[in-house]
């Protein structure tokens, strides 16, 4: 995934907001949960957003261990649940991010099912963060409908469905008092600037 500057800056701002009194000498841990947008499809590991975020925070004298990433291309919410169950995860991390749902939309999965499964994932994320909601970040689903991959499809329908799924995850983020980072508008800029996409012309 190429740099999405707005995303990284927002991550940093939220980090400082929730940790303004933290000692910068601590070596923080970070768990990233998601799908292809999290692992960074067709980019080097160092260029995916969890590693980029840690690298930028390091420039501000915040030390992080390497991010722990549980994500796979094509995963839906239920598949992420299975992935988490199979992963040998520690019980607690300083920060957790959750970005999942594009494949639920792509496969035409039910929105009520998404809401139920996303809520469970969000509760797990909060538990992984030591039951500190302020240390959890939900990221909105990017809009793949603006990419060449969507050629011949109903782009407005895709956008409307992405918005509907994002309305669900945003409401749940608010319900559980976690941070919400809306990256969708930034991903829609690829409609006029394909340089924002990876080589597959799908992932930002």
Regions found by a protein language model. Give the residues of each.
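Bacterial Sec-dependent N-terminal signal peptides
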Residues: 1-25
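Residues that line or immediately flank small-molecule/substrate-binding pockets and catalytic motifs
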Residues: 8, 34, 100
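Residues in and immediately flanking transmembrane alpha helices
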Residues: 15-16, 48, 195
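Serine-esterase "nucleophile elbow" of acetyl-processing enzymes
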Residues: 20-73, 83-91
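Short acidic active-site motifs
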Residues: 79
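Alpha-helical cap/lid subdomain in secreted, periplasmic
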Residues: 82-204
């Amino acid at each position: 995934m190429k740099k999405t500057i707005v995303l990284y800056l927002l991550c940093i701002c939220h980090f400082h907001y929730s940790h303004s009194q933290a000692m910068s000498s601590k070596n923080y841990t970070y768990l990233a949960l998601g799908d292809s947008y999290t692992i960074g499809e067709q980019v080097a590991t160092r260029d995916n957003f969890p590693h980029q975020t840690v690298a930028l925070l390091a420039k501000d004298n915040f030390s992080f261990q390497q991010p722990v990433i549980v994500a796979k291309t094509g995963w839906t919410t239920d598949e992420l649940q299975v992935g988490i169950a199979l992963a040998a995860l520690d019980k607690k991390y300083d920060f957790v991010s959750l970005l999942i749902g594009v494949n639920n939309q792509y496969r035409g999965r039910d929105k009520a099912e998404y809401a139920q499964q996303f809520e469970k994932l969000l509760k797990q994320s909060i538990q992984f963060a030591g039951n500190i909601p302020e240390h959890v970040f939900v990221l909105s689903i990017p809009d793949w409908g603006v990419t060449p991959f969507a050629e011949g499809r109903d782009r407005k329908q895709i956008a409307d469905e992405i918005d509907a799924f994002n309305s669900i995850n945003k409401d749940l983020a608010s319900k559980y008092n976690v941070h919400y980072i809306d990256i969708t508008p930034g991903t829609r800029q690829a409609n006029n600037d394909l340089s924002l996409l990876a080589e597959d012309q799908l992932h930002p």
